[in-house]
Amino acid sequence: MYIKLLIVVSIRKYTVQANCTVNLTVQYLAKKWTLLIILELYKGENYTRRFSELKDSLEGITPKILSERLKELEDEKIVSKTIDTSSFPVKCEYTLTESGLDLIEIIRTIKTWALKWKIDNIPCGKQDCKDCVL
């Protein structure tokens, strides 16, 4: 008599942990418009722009989404918000923090990668990047 022995091998599922640093960071940085908002702030004088300037420079973004993304970036200390009530209308400016400025290197790396692998290898200067400063 033959006894068949069935061995069940437990295969560990590899999933991203909820508290993984990359997972937590990607949750807000990978949202549509977030990196472009950071780039537009970087282009501003002293890395600062008013809400209306951001809205005008990001074609297609809605005021609601821009407000949400700026609030998320402010909560993460990537952007600081300054409100000047001494003028009318009230002036609200957003500025990249040191943390936000550190993200510019990541954006440069993304651009380098995209030019090499994804964007038909078109060198800068031949693309309409609206005076990109990267």
Task: Name every feature range the model reports, one short phrase each.
Residues 34, 46, 78, 112-115, ...:
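Generic structural signal for secondary-structure transition and capping sites
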Residues 16, 85-86:
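Short loop/turn motifs at secondary-structure junctions and domain boundaries
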Residues 86-107:
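Basic, amphipathic "hinge/linker" alpha-helix immediately C-terminal to the N-terminal HTH DNA-binding motif
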Residues 1-29:
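N-terminal leader segment of winged-helix/HTH proteins
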